[in-house]
């Protein structure tokens, strides 16, 4: 296990006068204790963990809810606010009643060393964050316990690089892995390995790097490994779809190879493999995203004016199991109308997926959407109706991350709420 000096953990106070404050809880039947904890939001559970050692023991022994899914039925939402000079991280707990939901802000202990960051991914309640200023720092972070770990730097560094990340957990190996795909121009100062196409720099060289974390991780074993050259050129964004222990990416079309591909990276055997695509028009013509909805791999295909279709792969890896489950029409939230001088300009980049993001399916069957990084909207597929979600304290500009609350760390069992 990595040493205590390697990462920061919150301290737990001792019981006052040696008397167990949690004695009252311990005397209750286990089913009652489990029922009590299941009704509490993760933010409340996190606070109780640090009241005293007795309460922490009770929560650890009786409050555990095992889950193998990275998409919880009652997720909380993390809102990454890209404010000038210093970024912020807020959260909304969707397990509370809608009228009582308030946006809360996390205190980031690493803010001085990494004031601006991107969220690489969320898995089992742990976040992987990357330095958006210098691209040389990565952190593992649990926002509810404030545990954090700065990951080591890669031995191989390149100038003028483009990065694609992935972060996930494999249920069989019980290992977390951080995937880093580097596209670069080469070590020389000339133009070898680089060319311009359609006004954009294209990098011809690449390297795939990976780092593993588990209960067996030590300071000596915590290091990056090279997997060689990347077999594909992916769209520059982190993987948002972790399904079946695999990260999923979309390839970038090339001049002579316009066909986009779906590619998975298996966190167990560390191999890239192509995934069959649905038989629908527009996949090669427009941009699209892969997301995880209720444990299924889904493809969001964008059309004009914010319209989109959601295709679901019901049986993983089987092409014939793809089916179009949802079609969502054009909608302009009131919040966007009030903040835009010319509201119709919003649809300019709609086909590139820069207007609407599909986040998750809610318990009531509604689809949670994010519009232009400013407004959250719930869409009812049965009624075909949209509802703007207005929460107190919502930042003016944010990137939403669907998150499963946990009190665990990378070297401990999962405790998901």
UniProtKB/Swiss-Prot annotation:
Ranges for domain F-box: 22-68
UniProt name for this protein: F-box protein At3g07870
NCBIfam families: F_box_assoc_1
InterPro entries: F-box-assoc_interact_dom, F-box-like_dom_sf, F-box_dom, KIB1-4_b-propeller, SCF_F-box_component
Matching Pfam families: Beta-prop_KIB1-4 (PF03478), F-box (PF00646)
GO cellular component: plasmodesma
Gene3D superfamilies: 1.20.1280.50
GO biological process annotation, one example: positive regulation of cell population proliferation
UniProt superkingdom: Eukaryota
């Amino acid at each position: 296990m990595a040493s205590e000096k390697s990462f920061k953990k919150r301290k737990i106070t001792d019981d006052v006068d040696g008397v167990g404050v949690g004695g009252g809880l311990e005397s209750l039947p286990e089913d009652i204790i489990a029922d009590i904890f299941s009704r509490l939001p993760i933010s409340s559970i996190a606070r109780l963990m640090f009241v005293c050692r007795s309460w922490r023991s009770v929560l650890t022994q009786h409050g555990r809810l095992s889950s193998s899914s990275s998409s919880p039925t009652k997720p909380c939402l993390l809102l990454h606010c890209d404010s000038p000079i210093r970024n912020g991280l807020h959260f909304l707990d969707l397990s509370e009643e809608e009228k009582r939901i308030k946006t809360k802000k996390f205190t980031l202990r690493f803010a001085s060393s990494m004031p601006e960051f991107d969220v690489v991914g969320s898995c089992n309640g742990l976040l992987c964050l990357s330095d958006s200023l210098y691209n040389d720092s990565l952190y593992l972070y649990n926002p509810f316990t404030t545990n954090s770990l700065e990951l080591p730097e890669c031995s191989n560094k390149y100038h003028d690089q483009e990065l694609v990340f992935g972060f996930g957990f494999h249920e069989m190996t019980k290992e977390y892995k951080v995937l880093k795909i580097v596209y670069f121009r080469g070590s020389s100062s000339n133009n070898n390995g680089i060319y311009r196409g359609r006004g954009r720099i294209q990098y011809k060289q690449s390297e795939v790097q990976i780092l593993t974390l588990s209960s067996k991780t030590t300071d000596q074993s915590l290091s990056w490994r090279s997997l060689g050259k990347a077999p594909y050129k992916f769209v520059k964004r982190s993987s948002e779809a972790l399904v079946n222990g695999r990260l999923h990416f979309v390839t970038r079309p090339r001049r002579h190879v316009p066909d986009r591909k779906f590619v998975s990276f298996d966190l167990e055997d560390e191999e890239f493999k192509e995934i069959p695509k649905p038989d629908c028009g527009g996949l090669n013509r427009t941009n699209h995203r892969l997301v995880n909805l209720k444990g299924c791999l889904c493809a969001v295909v964008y059309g004009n004016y914010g319209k989109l279709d959601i295709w679901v792969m019901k049986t993983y890896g089987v092409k014939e199991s793809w089916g179009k489950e949802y079609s969502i029409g054009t909608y302009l939230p009131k919040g966007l109308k009030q903040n835009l001088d010319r509201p119709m300009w919003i649809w300019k980049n709609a086909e590139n997926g820069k207007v609407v993001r599909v986040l998750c399916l809610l318990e009531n069957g509604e689809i949670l959407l994010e519009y232009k990084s400013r407004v959250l909207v719930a869409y009812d597929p049965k009624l075909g109706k949209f509802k703007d979600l207005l929460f107190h304290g919502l930042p003016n500009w944010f990137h939403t991350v669907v998150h499963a609350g946990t009190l665990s760390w990378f070297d401990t069992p999962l405790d998901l709420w």
